[in-house]
Amino acid sequence: NQNSLKEIFMIGVRNPQGMALSPQGEIFITNHGAKGGDFLGKIKGGENYGWDKIGWGGTNYSGTKIGDGESFSEKFKSPILSWVPSIAPSDLVFYSGEEFLDWNGDILITSLKYKFLLKLEIDKGEIIDKEIIFKDEIGRLRDVDINSKGEIFIITDEKKSAIWKLKSNTN
């Protein structure tokens, strides 16, 4: 929109938590819905995901409909993946490294609510496989990062969280 402020990159998200660049330089986010309607999406300048007109399958915490009650609409950008019930996605990262060679290019997403690390295998921009790497083992997962060797580090949102390091069984 020509009348938009230049400072506004995009609109229509409720509570974006994680953001990462794909190997192709595209921007991806995780977004909290209300009661359901969390999503993984690709963003570009000027786009609108539709919050608070649509709820991506979720409802308000009170149980009432979001906006006009539509989950999705052709008027707005659609997410790549949405979750109902909510998983409370927090962070995401595209894997690149030597520690988990088969994971190169895959997306890793942390979940606060279900306390899991999710791996999404991507091929030509499409999700072709989903795998929960671990669940309910260390707490509510807040952040994930990868060092230059490809080692994966995770932190929870607990006050005295340790930094957890994932290791491959093959290395």
Q: Whereabouts are the PLM-identified features?
A:
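Beta-propeller domain segments
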Residues: 1-131, 139, 149, 161, ...
